[in-house]
């Protein structure tokens, strides 16, 4: 595996490709019961919480997920946070489903949406890069879990084992903790 083998694609495309193409891997995938049989899993890479983020100044205090039916929430197409909202009765018409998480801080800052449902750690990292993280807070936790590498199940088991061994080596070296600390 070389750097040229790694391709950055929108989440939805990467998810579909990893499900259908042997020797493909999707980085940073939440392992859920619905996804369990679709992939071979390597990890865990990092803890994660899928949350709904809102502007602090708005003082949102939702008591249930139905609260979000009165607002517009940004999601990443096919992301676990989007799936959780839909499965719990939030109408698709109240979701602004996009393909690129890098666009979300700009959309939030422009008042085109009220909330963002996504992984808490990476969401606040992206907000921090725009210098607006202190204006937002997590207002609802959808799910806690872990991120894994999702590997197409037809991938050579030796390649999967090599990924597992590489992850174990990174964890043993201490680099894993350094990487996680950079995104807190």
What kind of region is each of these model predictions?
Residues 47-51, 128-167:
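Periplasmic-binding protein-like
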Residues 15-19, 28-38, 114-143:
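A ligand-binding cleft/hinge motif common to bilobed small-molecule-binding domains
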Residues 18-19, 68, 107-109:
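Hydrophobic residues within well-ordered alpha-helices
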Residues 13-14, 103-104, 112:
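Short acidic active-site motifs
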Residues 1-37, 97-98, 182:
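Extracytoplasmic small-molecule ligand-binding "clamshell" domains
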């Amino acid at each position: 595996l070389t750097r040229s083998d790694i391709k950055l694609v929108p989440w939805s495309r990467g998810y579909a490709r990893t499900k259908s193409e042997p020797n493909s891997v999707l980085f940073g995938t939440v392992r859920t019961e619905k996804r369990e049989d679709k992939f071979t899993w390597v990890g865990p890479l990092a803890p994660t919480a899928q949350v709904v983020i809102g502007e602090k100044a708005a003082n949102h205090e939702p008591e249930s997920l139905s609260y979000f039916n009165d607002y517009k929430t940004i999601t990443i197409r096919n992301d676990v946070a989007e799936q959780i909202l839909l499965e719990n009765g939030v109408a698709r018409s109240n979701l602004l489903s996009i393909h690129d998480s890098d666009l979300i801080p700009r959309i939030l800052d422009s008042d085109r949406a009220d909330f963002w449902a996504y992984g808490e750690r990476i969401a606040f990292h992206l907000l921090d890069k725009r210098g607006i993280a202190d204006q937002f807070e997590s207002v609802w936790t959808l799910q806690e879990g872990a991120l894994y590498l999702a590997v197409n199940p037809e991938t050579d088991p030796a390649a999967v084992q090599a990924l597992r061994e590489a992850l174990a080596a990174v964890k043993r070296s201490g680099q894993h903790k350094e990487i996680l600390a950079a995104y807190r």
